[in-house]
Amino acid sequence: MPPLLKLALELGPLLVFFFANARGEMLIERFPILGSIGAPIFLATALFMAATVIALAISWSMTRTLAIMPLVSGIVVLVFGALTLWLHNDTFIKMKPTIVNTLFGGILLGGLFFGKSLLGYVFDSAFRLDAEGWRKLTLRWGLFFIFLAIVNEIVWRNFSTDTWVSFKVWGIMPITIVFTLLQMPLIQKHSLTDEENTAS
């Protein structure tokens, strides 16, 4: 899959979520039937769920596979989005990033506790590292996911819904990109050469 299309499929649902929340009242004025869903955050949640399903469907149709992280995240979006709409309580969709990041962080750190560097199983086809490299990278990503979960809790519990939505779309992605780039020295240091990879 082309990198730009992959990025669009990852960012698309988030942009739909941001736009629907920011322009929800305008959309409801233009399409009154949408008002039955509720306030802009609930309309945004419904469209976020739809966009997530569409993005996963496009990804599946092109690659005949779904990466584990987008799949898990998509399932949580649908579950917590449905709870948000059913109970008419936006707390559930706000907690979704906390649940997903805690889940990923817990799995990675739990794997290390049992001596397994689980990132190696996920990204081994993308790049090869020695055992120490996978251990360090797994530890860093595990702690980073926990950090994101804590930050999400702080933001949604202490700021307005609009601020939380903006942070979710325009804050988390740049932070994640910067963190990813900061891992490049570690990846380069522990990368295996073709000879080492063949020998291992």
From Swiss-Prot:
Query: The organism sits in which domain of life?
Result: Bacteria
Q: Where are the transmembrane segments?
A: 1-21, 37-57, 66-86, 103-123, 136-156, 167-187
Q: Which GO terms describe its cellular component?
A: plasma membrane
**Its biological function?**
Plays a role in cell envelope biogenesis, maintenance of cell envelope integrity and membrane homeostasis.
- Give the protein family: Belongs to the YciB family.
Q: Do you know which HAMAP family this protein is assigned to?
A: YciB
Listed name of the protein: Inner membrane-spanning protein YciB
Which species does this protein come from? Answer: Brucella melitensis biotype 1 (strain ATCC 23456 / CCUG 17765 / NCTC 10094 / 16M)
